Amino acid sequence: YNLVSKANDQIEFSAGWGQTGVIGKLSLKFTNFSMKNFLNPKTYKGIIPQGEGQTLTLSGQTNGRYYQAYSISFMDPWFGGKRPNTLSVSAYFSKQTDISSNYLTNSGYGYGYPGYGYGYPGYYGGGYGYGSNYYGNYGYNNSYEYAYDPDKSIMMFGLAAGYGKRLNWPDDYFQFMATLNYQLYMMHDWDYFLVNNGNCHNINLELMLQRNSIDNPLYTRKGSQFMLSVAATPPYSLFDGKDYASMSSSDPDKYKFIEYHKWKFKAKIFSPLAPLTVKRTPVLMTRVEYGFLGTYNKNKKSPFETFYMGGDGMSGYSSTYAQETIGLRGYENGSIAGNGGYNSYGYAYSRLAMELRYPFLLEPSSTIYGLVFVEAGNAWTDLKNFNPFNLKRSAGVGVRIFLPMIGLMGLDWAYGFDEPNYGSNGKRSGSN
């Protein structure tokens, strides 16, 4: 039989207006793309060539003049055409700018003059409120939009190329993936962390071994997912002859070439609580995750690739360097690690969870299920302080909705039972 791949393209669009200007995101995902037929107009359906089951994703995001991000990725699940070997290539670029220092010193919250009256001087200033300030006159105004300072910026550029191969041993569910990554960070008067100016290069090789035996990616009733990965850069400090102990943390040359080794383990197990012949089978999902970021030289501890923990786990723009976002429902974003204070950088993390899922609708065109969960996790700035029993706990409820043209949407509400780590704003509950 001659089988023809069926397209399941997706488009994501959102737009709005905020105090920084236009806010929006546009993402196009073509799931039956054909690179081989790119120059063959007869194979085009719409604006792209189709027919080989390859995936092409284009994405753009903006938060006014303060943040823009663009990415493109290509994935061929049958590279070579004979075996399910995966080839992936991607590139991205983002730019974030800061606000003027005058705004920080001349604005405040609340009624009255900036930094005075019924309010207090905040890190991001007042913006809204009746009174006068550095950037406006009396009356209600939005000064944040006018505090834009293009001379303070961080730009990030990245490339990645990966190759994956399905293994026959120990069983057919195993897959091995190797990815070569390059990231360039270009900073100019970026005042938030150690490096304020200069360029930093991150060249690393990531090796990943995973096993996936789930029966359905949308509503999984049985099976498991295991993943073990390590990403490592060359150990520059072992052969470049530099005395990093005598270099200050703000010296751009200290982190010109970033070095680290990063280890991660993730596991999910799905257990049906009723016979699989029952259409609406409740499922118990258990999850375990650990992550560690190590160094070759104690005097060259990377501020990049650390763990940003807490909140919804959705990656977006921030004033920090490249960090891996780890969600912990029931706590504010970055309140466990990443928002400054004692846990500015997370070099180790642990996360455990149990979810009881029940399907309300299981149809080819849409899937809806609800869930209740308990979750616990924590992050540490030093590997020596890692303690898998010292965790921040939470519990909550949620819902997942899948629509073909939109994709998977989710809404969770959780309450955190423990105080966040020092340096956070202390908030624990809320929707994620």
Residue ranges: model-predicted function:
Residues D9-T20, K29, H188-F360, V372-F373, ...:
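C-terminal outer-membrane beta-barrel translocator/porin domains of Gram-negative envelope proteins
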Residues M314-T320, K384-N432:
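C-terminal beta-signal and terminal closure region of outer-membrane beta-barrel proteins
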Residues L167-F174, P275-P282, E363-S365, G407:
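Secondary-structure transition into beta-strands, especially the periplasmic turns and strand N-termini
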Residues N2-Y219, Q225, R329, L408, ...:
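Gram-negative/organellar outer-membrane beta-barrel architecture
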Residues G18-T20, A91, V288-Y290, I368-A379, ...:
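Active/binding-pocket-proximal capping segment
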Residues Q54, T367-I368:
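Alpha-helical scaffolds flanking conserved acidic
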